[in-house]
Amino acid sequence: MSCYRKRHFLLWLLRAVCMLHLTARGAYATVGLQGVPTWIYLGLKSPFIEFGNQVEQLANSSIPLNMTKDEQANMHQEGLRKLGTFIKPVDLRDSETGFVKADLTKRLVFDRPNNITSRPIHPIQEEMDQKQIILLDEDTDENGLPASLTDEDRKFIVPMALKNISPDPRWAATTPSPSALQPNAKAISTIVPSPLAQVEGDPTSNIDDLKKHILFLHNMTKTNSNFESKFVKFPSLQKDKAKTSGAGGSPPNPKRPQRPIHQYSAPIAPPTPKVPAPDGGGVGGAAYNPGEQPIGGYYQNEELANNQSLLKPTDTDSHPAAGGSSHGQKNPSEPQVILLNETLSTETSIEADRSPSINQPKAGSPARTTKRPPCLRNPESPKCIRQRRREEQQRQRERDEWFRGQSQYMQPRFEPIIQTINNTKRFAVSIEIPDSFKVSSEGSDGELLSRVERSQPSISSSSSSSSSSSRKIMPDYIKVSMENNTSVTDYFKHDVVMTSADVASDREFLIKNMEEHGGAGSANSHHNDTTPTADAYSETIDLNPNNCYSAIGLSNSQKKQCVKHTSVMPAISRGARAAIQECQFQFKNRRWNCSTTNDETVFGPMTSLAAPEMAFIHALAAATVTSFIARACRDGQLASCSCSRGSRPKQLHDDWKWGGCGDNLEFAYKFATDFIDSREKETNRETRGVKRKREEINKNRMHSDDTNAFNIGIKRNKNVDAKNDTSLVVRNVRKSTEAENSHILNENFDQHLLELEQRITKEILTSKIDEEEMIKLQEKIKQEIVNTKFFKGEQQPRKKKRKNQRAAADAPAYPRNGIKESYKDGGILPRSTATVKARSLMNLHNNEAGRRAVIKKARITCKCHGVSGSCSLITCWQQLSSIREIGDYLREKYEGATKVKINKRGRLQIKDLQFKVPTAHDLIYLDESPDWCRNSYALHWPGTHGRVCHKNSSGLESCAILCCGRGYNTKNIIVNERCNCKFHWCCQVKCEVCTKVLEEHTCK
């Protein structure tokens, strides 16, 4: 009989232990205190991108203007028209004229009438309307002028007719008149533009106004010395110089040679020295007369003025030119200005390059005093021919390089871009052009071969055969190009269709249309682009949609969005990684240093807490993801978005242009909201769904019925013999159960459960009880288990409100079982006021606060465009701030976070009414932070033991704060390093070995 009782007792004990295990897990399954999986795990290990060792940060090479050179030229002409016909004196101390002050920030206040009630607007538009405008100038000095300009540049103000922004090679070289070769004739050179140039307006139409204006400027320089310092002198227009211009007097050399006017513009190719044609066949058909003064305001340096001047007076008669157009005879004493217009092209004539000759001086003219260059004395020498070929090849390479830089801005007119451009091994883009849109090349085989030859990198040790072949190919190409007479702008008259991603690997994509016209070179030439471009992903990415189902930490709705928008996942992964790195930077000197684990919770069991630290993490992760998506849109890495299309801010000046290529905050804000908040909003989640809640309610009802039945049995057996140690057993069981409650969230839950079983068995076996008392004891144990786990926390009386709310906020929270337990024992407490709905509302609020932080720290950036630093045109766009700036802003919000609770209506409200209501930019939390000073097994937190601190610091990294008053250990570290290094001739560096003793302080 005793064996039967003992067997029955063991079976009952086993059933009680199993029931304890199941009820404990069921009670805390909805709370999720074992750690909540999060999508931030993509920052540790992502199937979409292979992370490197670098720190994630936004690309700072912003693109202020996403447009071609032609569009910039049109904008420049528009700005010149706004300046007026005559240039007025400029006061450098007046900012209204366009010069930038030292204070680059212009604050424009927009006052809205109070009586107007407007409907709610988008948060991005609301923030942009309140932004301060920052006017940028890359290199400015204390006066606000570009620091790269010299003194002569700062006082050089070019008249209207001289402002040619891009000399076009379509203007043909001047044709010499037949009568120019006749001696003893006086004429003025006739300039005949090419037929292509006649389509556009001739910039010499306002020549009379230009002359009057230049004379007006020189009269002003004589009366006002201050005014003279701001302008360039024109010696050829002075009256006394005009009278002696034909006497052979040499012009006085200025203190500093002025820059050519075309250098203030943006030419396609840099100007090269011109070689004069034989017998007056040079520019303007005039022969060179040494000793005479050049006419006009176009100045070269000393070498060009003595040897290769383009602007020369002539004494020959004027006759009709080849084109049939002629100019009337003019008085040689009248001041003349030869403009730098399109007829004076920067491109040299091929015939003049291949067969140059020397201008023979006339009879009676003074002999040349200086020795001419070798190429003028013997232009047919092999050395001079090679030099001319090298110059032509250099100009062609610069033109090709410029077109390659503009190839990425070629947008299709009829087809959208289906896929993005990613320079990776697994994902790349190829460009396909339909046959109906391809343009047949009219060039010969020599032209194609020359382009292939130019695209090869130049190697100093190249063979003689390759160099000779290039010499053979080059003249043919020059001949063909001159016969075809193709213009520079022909490259922009063709469309490019970007259709799909294909097989390009480890190289930049090439636009076929540009390649057919010689506009594209080698694949490695993108490093020399003049326009700043955003680099593609340097890491290897994999955009397979099947990776979304294997990604760890994503919810069901997030996986669905991942499949639909797989191309955005690398940006989200980089944003999650940047959030982890920024969190560790911001908290590196605090007690909790944002340590991570290798599981899907990223931060361990503390993710189940609604503490301020988790509020900061949620806000920072939402902010970084929004920033990286917005920057990826701007850089062209996503096919679903491009540059920002945001509306124009209200405080922006009317004359300023709103455009450029800004960060697409609108798309990033919407996508980040849908992706991140979907975990909190979905209704069929594992721990927060309606179905799970109903099962919990039904389970509570069943246990409530069982408890009522047990209470009836307890009332009948209220008096138990104290000699049998029944009360001692119940007390020990209660203590064991409460200890299990405090450690229920430990990862070693099974081990604690086994210890509890051993304690119960030991207490029962050591006590002397009979069969009837054992039955009563079973009922009491069962009652204690059920009441402790389920109903004691719900039946806890409501606490009275303390007068000191600060003390109440600093006091440790109470668990559901009503037992005061601090965090110092390693146990983790269940949330008292935070329910599942409150935690979801808290996460939604903090996510929105992170996105608002990105909008808050974004700025409106403007840049001046114009000649010599003048703001003839101002372009503005919106630009993101750095991740570090956003992290600093959110850390300040973390320090001022507000504690909230959920009310009866299911909404969050502040717990202490003395504090102000948090806005959408503030952080909120539900639970107080644990004690980070001591180790916690439940939180997987080792405490601050062994942390390095600073002894003499007064901040958070000081030993007094970081060590929590426990003191610190001091350790001396001896370091041997090289010092006092010196270089000895020859080729030796000798250093001494210095010994340093460093002190390291660690917390006890």
UniProtKB/Swiss-Prot annotation:
Post-translational modification: Glycosylated, glycosylation is stimulated by porcupine at the ER.
Subcellular location: Secreted, Extracellular space, Extracellular matrix
Pfam families in alphabetical order: wnt
Biased composition (Basic and acidic residues): 389-403
GO cellular component terms listed in the entry, alphabetical order: dendrite; extracellular region; extracellular space
Region annotation (Disordered) ranges: 238-298, 310-407, 438-472, 790-822
Family note: Belongs to the Wnt family.
Quaternary structure and partners: Interacts with porcupine (por).
Protein's name according to its UniProt entry: Protein Wnt-5
